[in-house]
């Protein structure tokens, strides 16, 4: 019979996800139904992503928010515009505070991104379009780019 020593788990560094939620969701389908008949070509997608981190009142608790906006156009129409603010509440347990910025800007967004991606795909499909499947995002590269821009 095996036993689990829970005392060591209390001191192991780890990230705990306390909640995930939609803060704001908006979908505009301004040219429907005309735009739905003109789906013979692949639309141009303009995508923007931003990450906001908020230190919450409880020690080592943070809200990490993904702000994703996508606008789809073809030659004739603005097909749709979707904006999503999706967030998670994270507790960084037994982690050196010097590591918090990279964890909150890279690892935490990577943990909640698949859920935000699914919401966007479902909403665009429900609007009558092919589901918008956002490619995986390299949050590490975004973080390092932002840090290098901040230093200059």
UniProtKB/Swiss-Prot annotation:
One of its GO terms (biological process) is protein tetramerization. SUPFAM superfamilies: SecB-like. Keywords: Chaperone, Cytoplasm, Protein transport, Translocation, Transport. It is found in: Cytoplasm. One of its GO terms (molecular function) is unfolded protein binding. Gene3D superfamilies: SecB-like. One of its GO terms (cellular component) is cytoplasm. It comes from the Bacteria. One of the proteins required for the normal export of preproteins out of the cell cytoplasm. It is a molecular chaperone that binds to a subset of precursor proteins, maintaining them in a translocation-competent state. It also specifically binds to its receptor SecA. Homotetramer, a dimer of dimers. One homotetramer interacts with 1 SecA dimer. Belongs to the SecB family. PANTHER family: PROTEIN-EXPORT PROTEIN SECB, PTHR36918. This is Protein-export protein SecB. It comes from Rickettsia massiliae (strain Mtu5).
């Amino acid at each position: 019979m095996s036993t689990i020593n829970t005392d060591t788990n209390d001191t192991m560094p780890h990230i705990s996800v306390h909640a995930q939620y939609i803060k704001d969701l908006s979908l505009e389908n301004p040219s429907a139904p005309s735009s739905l008949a003109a789906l013979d070509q692949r639309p141009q997608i303009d995508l923007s992503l931003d990450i906001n981190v908020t230190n919450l009142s409880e020690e080592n608790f943070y809200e990490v928010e993904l702000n994703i906006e996508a606008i789809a156009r073809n030659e004739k129409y603005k097909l749709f515009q979707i904006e999503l603010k999706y967030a998670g509440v994270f507790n960084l347990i037994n982690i050196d505070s010097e590591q918090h910025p990279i964890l909150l800007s890279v690892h935490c967004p990577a943990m909640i991104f698949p859920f935000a991606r699914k919401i966007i795909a479902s909403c665009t499909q429900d609007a009558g379009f092919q589901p918008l499947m956002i490619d995986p995002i390299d949050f590490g590269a975004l973080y390092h780019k932002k840090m290098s821009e901040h230093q200059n």
